[in-house]
């Protein structure tokens, strides 16, 4: 059934004229009183039930809960509904799988899929927010309690779902170089998660991403079936950039970077990603001011008051031993500098650092000019395998992988929060 959004900037007879054309079962009054007397006057004029509340979303929630709404038609306009508020409404409706349609726009959610195995979805408000680092953290946290399978969907993922037994094999630089030489993207997320979490991963691919975060093409359905066949206690889905699987998981962890501020949270379809969250992880919180962190926290709470917010920073976690002088390569110049300083405090002599893993040509030029004695320390991202590892091996150097470990700066415990979320989900499903 259809629901109409109406306002008091239109005369009641104009609203009635439009309502008769679209024939909704009910309406939500979204504000504006310039051309009306009272809500009762509108109800009499329209002859349908009109829901209203000072909070638009409370009125929408009540209308949707009492009616089988599949489509919301927006008959309002500015100044009552601003573009930002319309995106908030769209985010709210797409979360519920309801189409939102206006005079010159239509937002239609991909069908949300449900699975019978307990699941958590890790999604991001954008690229380079630390989503895969959190994915690995969640995987290695939960493997202490459950059999975990992580399902990824990357732009460099395989054409057919690929299983990596991170629980049984060691992900070595030599192995990844061989994978790269076979023409595969050896730094794809399912390899990184297998490396950092030590769990089974299923790599999938996707192409294209819509405004709300749904992909144009993906093979996630095939990936789900393979994941289920591995008999996990819990499946962890991991998005790609701002795009994520259209799986209505039992729990959501949304990742946003403090460096991005509130824009990715409040604007466009940021409210959808925040609104889905049980836990919101704010990464790189040590890189911004206290005032900016307060604004970020307030923005999250305004959209999702129930979300458990964690302010975190990343610290380097080495997967292997480092001896002698080393270089470090990451995808971010700021993190490269910061990590080099932290590794120096650990007794490692860093002779060069670069944040150009995602810029292969620049990276190659840098490495050609650098002399180092022993080890290349590298994140498993972008050009890590086909540039850094290949270069290091050609010079007889060792490679040690670098992981980004989240640490709370707010006195809270992200590990405990992840465990509690998983326990609730598993218990609710009776596993």
UniProtKB/Swiss-Prot annotation:
Keyword RNA-binding applies: no
Transmembrane segments: none
Localization: Cytoplasm
Key words of the record: ATP-binding, Cytoplasm, Ligase, Nucleotide-binding
Reactions catalysed: (2R)-2,3-bisphosphoglycerate + ATP + H(+) = cyclic (2R)-2,3-bisphosphoglycerate + ADP + phosphate
Principal localisation: cytoplasm
GO CC, alphabetical: cytoplasm
Source taxon at top rank: Archaea
A GO biological-process term: gluconeogenesis
Gene Ontology MF term list: ATP binding; cyclic 2,3-diphosphoglycerate synthetase activity; ligase activity
EC number: 6.5.1.9
Keyword ATP-binding among record annotations: yes
Function: Catalyzes the formation of cyclic 2,3-diphosphoglycerate (cDPG) by formation of an intramolecular phosphoanhydride bond at the expense of ATP.
HAMAP family per UniProt: Cyc_PG_syn (MF_01908)
Similarity section: Belongs to the cyclic 2,3-diphosphoglycerate synthetase family.
Protein name in UniProt: Cyclic 2,3-diphosphoglycerate synthetase
Natural source organism: Pyrococcus furiosus (strain ATCC 43587 / DSM 3638 / JCM 8422 / Vc1)
Lineage, uppermost ranks: Archaea, Methanobacteriati, Methanobacteriota, Thermococci, Thermococcales
């Amino acid at each position: 059934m259809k629901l109409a959004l109406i306002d008091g900037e239109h005369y009641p007879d104009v609203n009635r004229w439009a309502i008769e054309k679209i024939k909704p079962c009910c309406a939500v009054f979204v504000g504006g009183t310039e051309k009306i007397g009272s809500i009762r006057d509108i109800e009499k004029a329209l002859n349908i039930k009109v829901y209203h509340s000072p909070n638009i979303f409370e009125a929408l929630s009540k209308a949707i809960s009492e009616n089988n709404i599949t489509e919301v038609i927006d008959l309002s306009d500015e100044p009552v509904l601003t573009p930002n508020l319309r995106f908030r409404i769209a985010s709210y409706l797409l979360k519920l799988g309801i189409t939102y349609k206006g005079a010159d726009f239509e937002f239609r959610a991909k069908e949300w899929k449900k699975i019978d195995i307990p699941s958590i979805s890790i999604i991001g408000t954008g690229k380079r927010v630390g989503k895969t680092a959190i994915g690995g953290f969640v995987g290695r946290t939960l493997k202490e309690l459950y059999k975990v399978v992580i399902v990824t969907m990357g732009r460099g993922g395989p054409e057919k779902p690929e299983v990596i037994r991170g629980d049984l094999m060691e992900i070595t630089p030599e192995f990844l170089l061989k994978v790269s030489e076979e023409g595969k993207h050896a730094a794809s997320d399912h390899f990184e998660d297998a490396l950092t979490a030590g769990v089974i991963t299923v790599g999938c691919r996707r192409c294209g991403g819509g405004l709300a975060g749904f992909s144009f093409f993906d093979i996630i359905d095939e990936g789900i079936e393979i994941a289920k066949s591995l008999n996990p206690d819990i499946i962890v889905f991991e998005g790609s950039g701002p795009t994520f699987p259209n799986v209505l998981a039992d729990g959501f962890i949304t990742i946003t970077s403090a460096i991005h501020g509130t824009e990715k949270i409040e604007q466009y379809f940021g409210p959808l990603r925040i609104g889905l969250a049980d836990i919101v992880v704010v990464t790189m919180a040590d890189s911004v001011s206290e005032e900016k962190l307060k604004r970020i926290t307030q923005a999250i709470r305004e959209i999702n008051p129930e979300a458990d917010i964690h302010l975190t920073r990343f610290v380097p976690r080495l997967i292997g031993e480092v001896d002698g002088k080393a270089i470090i390569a990451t995808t971010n110049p700021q993190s490269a500098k910061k990590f080099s300083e932290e590794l120096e405090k650990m007794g490692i002599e860093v002779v060069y650092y670069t944040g150009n893993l995602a810029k292969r040509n620049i990276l190659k030029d840098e490495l050609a000019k650098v002399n180092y004695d022993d080890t290349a320390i590298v994140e498993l991202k972008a050009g890590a395998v086909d540039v850094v590892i290949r270069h290091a091996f050609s010079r007889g150097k060792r490679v040690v992988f670098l992981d980004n470990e989240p640490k709370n700066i707010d006195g809270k415990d992200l590990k405990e929060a992840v465990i509690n979320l998983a326990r609730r989900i598993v218990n609710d499903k009776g596993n």
